[in-house]
UniProtKB/Swiss-Prot annotation:
A biological process term (GO) from this entry: envenomation resulting in negative regulation of voltage-gated potassium channel activity in another organism
Disulfide bridge map: 21-71, 30-54, 46-67, 89-139, 98-122, 114-135
Protein name, entry field: Doenitin-1
Domain of life: Eukaryota
Miscellaneous note of the record: Has no significant hemolytic activity.
UniProt entry tagged with the keyword Repeat: yes
Recorded GO MF terms: serine-type endopeptidase inhibitor activity; toxin activity
The organism of origin for this protein: Haemaphysalis doenitzi
Amino acid sequence: MKLFIFLALFGAAFAQRNGFCRLPAEPGICRAFIPRYYFDVEKGQCEEFIYGGCKGNENNFETLKECKDACTEPEKASDFEKADFETGCKPAPETGHCLASHERWFFNTASGECEAFTYGGCGGNDNNYESKEECEFACKY
């Protein structure tokens, strides 16, 4: 009986904590142009959207990592995908056309290593990885 109560309370707390992940992307009523992330229930992953700067809802994260931490299971190295070398590893990194400042990783063909660069939040190319580990898995091994 104690186990049942514990599981019921744990389940309720988890559902309440992550209930906002089921909300739709809500840009709000203001007119700013702020790249943000929300969890898309239908796709089962975090997606970028443009936030207006006010109102909205709790399914609104400044970084992709914050969204994933709140709404998805932790990634394992096996979740990473190999990249097409010509499009995902060979091009020089592109910061994109937005003005955010996200640390990302790209594969440098000259050094044969994954290196950090600053990503603006939208646009760019496929040589753009969220972690050094993901970049290395995609391009080095």
